[in-house]
Amino acid sequence: MNGVSEGTRGCSDRQPGALTQGHSCSRKMNASRCLSEEVGSLRPLTMAVLSASFVVGVLGNGLVPWVTVFRMARTVSTVCFFHLALADFMLSLSLPILVYYIVSRQWLLGEWACKLYTGFVFLTFSTSNCLLVLISVDRCISVLYPVWALNHRTEQRASWLAFGVWLLAAALCSAHLKFRTTRKWNGCMQCYLQFNLENETAQMWTQEVFGRQMAVIMAHFLLGFLGPLAIIGTCAHLIRAKLLREGWVHANRPKRLLLVLVSALSAGSHLT
């Protein structure tokens, strides 16, 4: 759900973007179908990927919270991984709704369900990204300042930080609660982002609506991808440099971990 659909007056003959990506005015649509021919041709593959992700995500991420709570000692790391697995588990649970949307080719659950579902997806996805950043910073501090970390890293502080991450993610997804709406197009109901509000003049539209659209796009890109990537990359570089100075033979492991995290962030931002 990365990217922003356009529900604007400037293109009255445009199909509003659904849960995925906005469509351009020039895209030719088949009036007898609710999705474009390009999207329709990818439906089987998309459904297979989402179904597999649902099964693996629910089983894998559902096991991690149980293990961290009942089978492991409570530490800063287990607190962070518990919340990370919980966010990913919740995101996995939402995938059947997306599969249902793809099967029906339109949004049939109403406007408030449109707002709540997209807000929920961005809440869990943003929480997962922010927790990856928190884990990376925690690892970096532990390696660079071990004495300070030993005296100040506590489970209680980790829990408060994790709670703060959830609040930050909730703030990031608030735009979907405000601007998400539904609209019929060619007889098919779509769930999309509508940036022009009621009682706005044409002059206000150009400035205000475009500003809202760009603000949401930049917030998602900077806070959902580029920002976490920069922080995680910096932490991995600092850890690797410290380990190399100390002659650790496995100093390249943080680099490989960074590649895995980058792949996860990139794949997640495009899948959603």
UniProtKB/Swiss-Prot annotation:
Pfam family, one: 7tm_1
Region (Disordered): 1-24
Protein location: Cell membrane
Positions in the Extracellular compartment: 1-46, 100-116, 180-213
The entry's keywords: Cell membrane, Disulfide bond, G-protein coupled receptor, Glycoprotein, Membrane, Receptor, Transducer, Transmembrane, Transmembrane helix
GO molecular function, one term: N-formyl peptide receptor activity
GO BP: complement receptor mediated signaling pathway; inflammatory response; phospholipase C-activating G protein-coupled receptor signaling pathway; positive regulation of cytosolic calcium ion concentration
Gene Ontology cellular component annotations, sorted alphabetically: plasma membrane
Entry keyword Protein biosynthesis: no
Topology with respect to the bilayer: Multi-pass membrane protein
Transmembrane segments annotated in the record for this chain: 47-67, 79-99, 117-137, 159-179, 214-234
Family, per entry: Belongs to the G-protein coupled receptor 1 family.
Function: Orphan receptor.
Name of the molecule in the record: Putative G-protein coupled receptor GPR32P1
